[in-house]
């Protein structure tokens, strides 16, 4: 588990923005991919959502019929979860697995109940893109669990790195179902911090007086906030991208990133 944090040999990195350019996280991931590719080679695998079609393909993904072919042919995944494997067209040209996750919508009540019982994640107040993010995260985690079993040799140390609240439920799934895989969680900005600013409240003027749980209830952000907080507290390693965001996490999530 946490021993795998040091000198890992296999790295899975999951984000909604793998091969899916939405915002700044895409830039963060694509910038570091070249360095990680030199370190891990074909043991670096990015996992992203398959939100594409033949009519609207990803301009950043080149599918391969040979990469991880044996695993794909023999992978045991829940019905409806499918993958496409290829290369992400960024510096380093890393392997990417795109995951089709729509089938998990029908099972969301089961998973939400499980996450409440195990980690006290409150999905009762979910709305908007919460279901989409969680379905993807769970499917990605199932893929990571399956693929890591195929790739790993006896002495391999595996890390699964999850970015943002949208992948938090995947981290919790790995924590519960594949505890030998070390987990890293990175937030690029807290969901409740974004909501405070989005509601025209002065985040930094009254920063030390904000309580994340209280503000989540006030702004109807309980689900995203509780998921993000649970992921941060349960990860083997919690990180962020700047000191100011680390301060935000410490105040609103009640845990200081490394």
Model-based region annotation:
Residues 1-258:
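Catalytic cores of nucleotide-sugar-dependent glycosyltransferases that transfer UDP/GDP/TDP-activated
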């Amino acid at each position: 588990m946490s021993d795998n944090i040091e000198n890992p040999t296999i790295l899975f990195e999951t984000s909604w923005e793998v091969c899916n350019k939405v915002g700044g996280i895409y830039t963060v991931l694509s910038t570091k991919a070249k360095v990680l590719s030199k370190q891990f080679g074909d043991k670096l695998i990015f996992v992203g959502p398959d939100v594409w079609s033949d009519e609207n393909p990803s301009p950043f993904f080149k599918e391969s019929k040979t990469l991880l072919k044996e695993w794909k042919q023999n992978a045991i995944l829940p019905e409806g979860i499918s993958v496409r494997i290829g290369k992400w067209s960024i510096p380093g040209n890393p392997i990417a697995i795109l995951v089709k996750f729509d089938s998990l919508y029908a099972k969301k009540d089961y998973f939400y109940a499980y996450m409440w019982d195990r980690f006290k994640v409150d999905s009762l107040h979910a709305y908007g893109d919460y279901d989409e993010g969680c379905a993807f995260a769970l499917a990605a985690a199932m893929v990571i669990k399956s693929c890591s079993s195929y790739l790993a040799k006896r002495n391999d140390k595996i890390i699964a790195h999850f970015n943002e609240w949208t992948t938090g439920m995947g981290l919790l799934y790995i924590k519960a179902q594949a505890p030998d895989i070390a987990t890293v969680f990175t937030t690029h900005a807290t969901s409740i911090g974004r909501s405070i600013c989005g509601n025209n409240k002065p985040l930094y003027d009254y920063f030390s007086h904000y309580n994340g749980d209280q503000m989540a209830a006030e702004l109807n952000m309980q689900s995203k906030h509780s998921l993000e907080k649970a992921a941060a507290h349960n990860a083997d390693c919690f990180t962020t991208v700047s000191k100011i965001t680390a301060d935000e996490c410490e105040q609103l999530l009640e845990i200081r990133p490394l």
